[in-house]
Amino acid sequence: MKNIISLLACALIFSTVTMAQELKNLDFISPFHAEVAAVKKGGMWAFINMDGTLVIDYRDDLVMTNESGIACCEPDIARDYPFFESNRALIKEIKQGIAYYGYINSTGETVIEPEFINATNFHSNRAIVLKVFKETIGRNELLGKNVVSYSYNEEIINSDGETVAFLRGPFNLILDEKNLKTPPKIQSRFLGPNLISTKSENNTWEIQTINQK
């Protein structure tokens, strides 16, 4: 029994020392937002709580909101670090050379799979995303495969990833790495919890109210 207690004590001391080492030599520490702060070390990001405890370990898929092509928010509040809003933070996954965006919760669990070719941070439990759609338009019998086309819509999702409003689209999409080095721009922005402004093709703006869901 004494041996077990000693082993547990050693494990606790070791984990404490390890945690202290992990929080040294940091490259960047963000301000606190939603009671957590982002810390950067060696090109990877993690989150600490207000006690300085690492609550999400270092990972390489977190998205800085001023990243090129990402329409997170208004330029004056874009941040050069990841952050949480509405218990969601943006992540990125590269599939066949194309970046797809999704969200994790405050425990680091992926709650909305990376499936959007652009996405904003959440605002009052909602986010604006570019959602991809695939349509079979025929079949190439010679090659023995379906002929497909892709398009995307600009939509609003809730914190469960469900579409709650349609904004724009569909727009034709060439789904390959060369064409999507930079994601298509999101042309809408939040003015308030239920108010959205959207830029039209003639560079004017329209405002619409989004029903609560």
Protein language model features and the residues they cover:
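N-terminal secretory signal peptides that target proteins for export/translocation
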Residues: 1-2
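Sec/Tat signal peptide C-region and signal peptidase I cleavage site
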Residues: 16-20
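Bacterial N-terminal signal peptides
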Residues: 6-15
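Residue-level detector of conserved, function-critical positions
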Residues: 21-213
